[in-house]
């Protein structure tokens, strides 16, 4: 049976659960939080009506979901060779031949094209930023840097930080220092998050010959790098001074709490996996709490 002529190599069509794995729905959903926060902050700071802005928000969320999901599907297509080596990737439909390459590419490019149309309907800046995110993630991260340099995580952080900027421009139609500040928060957050994950999967990345920082430079060098990015996060709440001193204080406490955890939870060499897990879990909570603060504090200020 020709793989290019059927939806899957095994019996039955791709399930919704498998579709979510193909487009990395968990990653997409996580990025929709800062995307919405960007739109919400633009509405509040520019005194727009929330009700009249709902169509823009919905179109932005749909467009963002489609371009991110499409780019992730294309990443899965390109990474099939290394995913087959890594134990944590064995459930992916692209690894166990649940979807053909032809249909995977149709799904990927179809989602990205429709998503870009949605963003360009909103305005040109949103569409352009979305396109830059696609090109950055697929070309500069997936195809080039992921397999060739330990700077891959930092390079991938550029396209990974565009969701709140798209959210902002969907409402305002132009960039601002506030949008750039949101970008910088996500940009600095990503290396800490993904280095922690890379420590946990160090052996897998080494086996697949992917030059993640822990696999090439070791744990101590990676830990130092994570603290550098934690320090860079510290001043960023002050760039969002429009949200007031309460937000700055609470966001700074979030940052200091992360630094404290990093300093106190590592006792001995054998603890590095436990330490990485704690840092990874904190990173997930940090993302939600930070942007929840953005929304809640701005709502309180508006009242």
UniProtKB/Swiss-Prot annotation:
* Reaction it catalyzes: heme b + (2E,6E)-farnesyl diphosphate + H2O = Fe(II)-heme o + diphosphate
The record, for CDD domains, names:
PT_UbiA_Cox10 (cd13957)
- Topology class, membrane: Multi-pass membrane protein
Pfam families, alphabetically? UbiA (PF01040)
Where in or outside the cell it occurs: the entry states:
Cell membrane
From the record, give the transmembrane residue ranges: 25-45, 54-74, 104-124, 125-145, 151-171, 179-199, 228-248, 280-300
Which InterPro entries does its entry note? Protohaem_IX_farnesylTrfase, UbiA_prenyltransferase, UbiA_sf
Oligomeric state and interaction partners are given as:
Interacts with CtaA.
Name this polypeptide is given: Protoheme IX farnesyltransferase
Species name: Staphylococcus carnosus (strain TM300)
């Amino acid at each position: 049976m020709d793989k290019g002529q059927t939806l899957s190599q095994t019996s039955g069509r791709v399930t919704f659960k498998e579709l979510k794995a193909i487009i990395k729905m968990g990653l997409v959903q996580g990025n929709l939080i800062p995307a919405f926060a960007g739109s919400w902050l633009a509405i509040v700071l520019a005194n727009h009506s929330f009700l009249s802005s709902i169509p823009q928000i919905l179109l932005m969320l749909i467009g963002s979901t489609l371009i991110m999901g499409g780019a992730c599907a294309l990443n899965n297509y390109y990474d099939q060779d290394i995913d087959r080596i890594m134990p944590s990737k064995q459930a992916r439909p692209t690894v166990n031949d649940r979807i053909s390459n032809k249909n995977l590419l149709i799904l990927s490019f179809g989602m990205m094209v429709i998503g870009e149309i949605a963003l360009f309907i909103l305005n040109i800046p949103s569409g352009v930023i979305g396109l830059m995110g696609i090109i950055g993630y697929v070309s500069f991260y997936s195809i080039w840097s992921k397999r060739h340099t330990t700077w891959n995580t930092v390079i991938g952080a550029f396209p990974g930080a565009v969701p709140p900027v798209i959210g902002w421009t969907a409402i305002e139609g132009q960039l601002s220092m506030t949008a750039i500040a949101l970008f910088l928060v996500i940009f600095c957050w990503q290396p800490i998050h993904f280095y922690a994950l890379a420590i946990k999967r160090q052996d897998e990345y080494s086996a697949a010959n992917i030059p993640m920082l822990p696999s090439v430079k070791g744990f101590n060098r990676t830990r130092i790098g994570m603290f550098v990015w934690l320090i860079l996060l510290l001043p960023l709440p002050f760039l969002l001074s429009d949200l007031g001193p309460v937000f700055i204080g609470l966001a700074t406490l979030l940052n200091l709490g992360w630094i404290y955890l990093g300093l106190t939870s590592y006792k001995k060499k054998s603890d590095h996996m436990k330490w990485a897990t704690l840092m990874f879990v904190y990173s997930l909570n940090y993302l939600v709490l930070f942007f929840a603060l953005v929304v809640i504090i701005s709502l309180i200020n508006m009242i």
